[in-house]
Design a protein with these regions (language model features):
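Hydrophobic alpha-helical connector segments
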Residues: 63, 77-111, 165-169
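Amphipathic alpha-helical packing segments from all-alpha helical-bundle domains
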Residues: 92, 107, 113, 117-119, ...
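An amphipathic alpha-helix signature
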Residues: 19, 62, 91, 95, ...
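A short secondary-structure junction motif
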Residues: 68-75, 108, 125, 143, ...
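Hydrophobic/aromatic-rich alpha-helical bundle segments in the mid-to-C-terminal region
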Residues: 130, 138, 152-201, 211-217
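N-terminal intrinsically disordered/low-complexity leader segments
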Residues: 1-13, 76, 211-217
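Helix-loop "lid/cap" segments that line or gate small-molecule binding pockets
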Residues: 83-84, 99-106, 115-123, 202, ...
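Helix-turn-helix
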Residues: 17, 21, 25-59, 63-67
Length: 217
């Protein structure tokens, strides 16, 4: 039993090395331009070793997307846990949350990798991104809808369609940053804050509940 553990650790390390090398090559060359030989050279393994783990390039590509998605989702859901839960300073708190969300989705390495692949390969190989569509935007939208529901139940927001509101919020907070990130630039802190604040103000104009000021005695 114990004798098998070093071999298992070695296999795990080799698999991780292949995934990291494949991610780098796919990001650089795209799916169609990447070759197993190039991935093998980058991972310092043989071509046959890759085929021992993954039967074809498409299988390897799907494994890479799943691996990156797992890491990205772990970071993303830690951000979702910081969603504001009260009406106090809602604009400021939602703005800070939107900044953290964009830093996780758009500005980190995994987020950039996924978006680059989606833009470059999604149209030609839509089936390869089923995992991304189901477990990326879909999960985030559902989680946000549930979070907005809590604020709606407290009378802070007036939302009829929570799923639509969640999609609109996501569209607002990253729309102005998409091209910046697509061309390989990292948005400045000032741009992240301005974009988030404008998005939140627009969102609250649509869904925020305005309570009348108390009457003067």
């Amino acid at each position: 039993m114990k004798a098998g553990r070093p071999a298992q650790r070695g296999q795990c390390a080799k698999r991780l090395s292949i995934l990291e090398a494949a991610a780098a090559v796919f990001c650089r060359e795209g799916f169609s331009g990447a070759s197993i030989d190039e991935i093998a050279a980058e991972a310092c393994v043989s071509r046959q070793t890759i085929y021992n783990h993954y039967r074809e390039k498409e299988t390897l590509f799907t494994a890479v997307v799943e691996d990156v998605m797992d890491r990205s989702n772990a970071a993303l859901f830690s951000v979702l846990a910081t969603f504001p839960d009260t009406a106090d300073n809602l604009e400021n708190e939602l703005t800070a949350f939107a900044v953290r969300l964009n830093q996780s989705c758009l500005c980190n390495h995994d987020g950039k990798f996924l978006r680059k692949l989606v833009y470059s390969e999604g149209e030609r190989y839509p089936h390869l991104f089923e995992t991304w569509r189901q477990h990326g935007p879909g999960k985030v939208g559902s989680a946000l809808a549930a979070l907005f529901s809590r604020l709606a139940h407290k009378g802070v927001l007036a939302i009829d369609d929570l799923d639509l509101a969640a999609r609109q919020f996501l569209a607002l907070v990253n729309a102005d940053l998409q091209m910046t990130v697509l061309f390989g630039e990292t948005p400045s802190d000032d741009l992240l804050e301005r974009t988030a604040r404008n998005a939140v103000r627009t969102f609250l104009r649509a869904y925020g509940v305005q309570h009348p000021a108390p009457a003067e005695a």
